[in-house]
Amino acid sequence: MKKQNNGLIKNPFLWLLFIFFLVTGFQYFYSGNNSGGSQQINYTELVQEITDGNVKELTYQPNGSVIEVSGVYKNPKTSKEETGIQFFTPSVTKVEKFTSTILPADTTVSELQKLATDHKAEVTVKHESSSGIWINLLVSIVPFGILFFFLFSMMGNMGGGNGRNPMSFGRSKAKAANKEDIKVRFSDVAGAEEEKQELVEVVEFLKDPKRFTKLGARIPAGVLLEGPPGTGKTLLAKAVAGEAGVPFFSISGSDFVEMFVGVGASRVRSLFEDAKKAAPAIIFIDEIDAVGRQRGVGLGGGNDEREQTLNQLLIEMDGFEGNEGIIVIAATNRSDVLDPALLRPGRFDRKVLVGRPDVKGREAILKVHAKNKPLAEDVDLKLVAQQTPGFVGADLENVLNEAALVAARRNKSIIDASDIDEAEDRVIAGPSKKDKTVSQKERELVAYHEAGHTIVGLVLSNARVVHKVTIVPRGRAGGYMIALPKEDQMLLSKEDMKEQLAGLMGGRVAEEIIFNVQTTGASNDFEQATQMARAMVTEYGMSEKLGPVQYEGNHAMLGAQSPQKSISEQTAYEIDEEVRSLLNEARNKAAEIIQSNRETHKLIAEALLKYETLDSTQIKALYETGKMPEAVEEESHALSYDEVKSKMNDEK
């Protein structure tokens, strides 16, 4: 109940409504007290009433250049004028008093006094008083003062918590953490051993700067952490602060930019001022590309708010006196869009690429995230790491979290191998849709489609191994085949990429050979194949006709002018022809493989229709012997990790 009242009080509309009634009521009651039973008349009416002898008393008071006149009628008058708020019909009232204002051009005080005396009216003269002036002034100013007071109070509440007032828009929004509050250490960051080695110097400088400065060394003013999302860039920055034992100021790049001009630059100055007071300290700017994009290409023109903020950031990082002991660590996914002035030596002069972890790194990451999870004995994290190539730390954490959720839904007390297997499928392809009604014809189409991918992958197995195939719908896919690399690869050869292209074409080719139809199930296959083939031609120089030339590099930024065409129409045509040639070659290769292995292709498709999901051991048995393993034929069940381990050993 208390929270509801606070919400009502802080509602701006209710405040404005309250202030309106307050001011209106104040003015109404003030005017009502001063004018009850009285009417305002002009100078002509005043002279007429005095001449008619209907004025009993007359009081006038000089008020600057005008004369304020009031009086009492001998014979009260009746009036139907509204003197206040009327809710129904106006009432008839008796008017005994009157007021009037006489200008210097109307008459003089002596003439008015003589006229009133001649007609037997009692005249009273009041000297000009300053109190009346002050009362009128207060009546005019007090309501507006109250209005502005409440408006500023509301702006203070809406200006953000933490005691901010409406004048504090320019204060830094960074979250400050004292060294005692930072519990993250290098041991908590797994799978980034090389990256940690690059940051050791930063930690050592913050701990003992004299050891470097006496040799004339200059520690990097800024460290740029670049890498895909989820690789642990923020965690690395916290670990540096934790190991060095220094305060940590964290802020997002988007927090600098506001609709008010100059706010971003002011926040940058405020951030560095706070860091200087706490030096030595670390400033961490997450997603710095939000504020550090190249100047002159923004949507707001050449002198927009973002550019002013960037200019101030450049100035603060440029080695001004007093910045010693402050190291700026920034994280981004797109260093290619950052302003060159931000990346020059003296600012972000050290760049650390935080890449995807290898199999050992993935295993170490899994061990870190499995500390608070009860795992069964059949769970082998090394095997999970082998099955998740390309996964980053966030993906691996998500796998274990999904496994815990799956185990909870199944009312288990520990997480076993089947839970992790299901979690991997959910992360890769989405939740299964077992209740989705699929016609028998469509099931056959999907089975032969996935069997086409599988048979091509089995034949072309130089770099990748078929790990799993299923026709259980997940996400938007009717089925899928997973092929894992035999080992972590940083480089792909032209032949490896051609094999992948042929594997992607296997599904559509199988549809055409078996059913003589073309379905929409191959749309994602074509998308991946086209992207890969175009990259081979335009980025990797793998076209014999076009040669080792890169035609497409960094993509244009949002807000930048359209990039000038660096290739001719003829070259663009030749690029399209080369891409088409690669895809047709892959298609023909897939067709040749499926035609040569029609019986095996049919066996895999029929097994998929019966069991829905096949693992690597079952697929290998069908390919080599034409039969399913006997243990699996007896009963369909979720594979244990012991079975998966034996399959992985067989694949090797």
UniProtKB/Swiss-Prot annotation:
Feature: compositional bias, Basic and acidic residues: 634-652
Cellular localisation: Cell membrane
Pfam families found in the cross-reference section: AAA (PF00004), AAA_lid_3 (PF17862), FtsH_ext (PF06480), Peptidase_M41 (PF01434)
GO cellular component, one term: plasma membrane
Keyword Ion transport: no
Membrane topology summary: Multi-pass membrane protein
Membrane-spanning intervals of the chain: 12-32, 132-152
Disulfide bonds: none
GO terms of molecular function: ATP binding; ATP hydrolysis activity; ATP-dependent peptidase activity; metalloendopeptidase activity; zinc ion binding
Main location: membrane
Known function: Acts as a processive, ATP-dependent zinc metallopeptidase for both cytoplasmic and membrane proteins. Plays a role in the quality control of integral membrane proteins.
Name the UniProt record assigns to this protein: ATP-dependent zinc metalloprotease FtsH
Biological source species: Streptococcus pneumoniae serotype 4 (strain ATCC BAA-334 / TIGR4)
Lineage: Bacteria, Bacillati, Bacillota, Bacilli, Lactobacillales
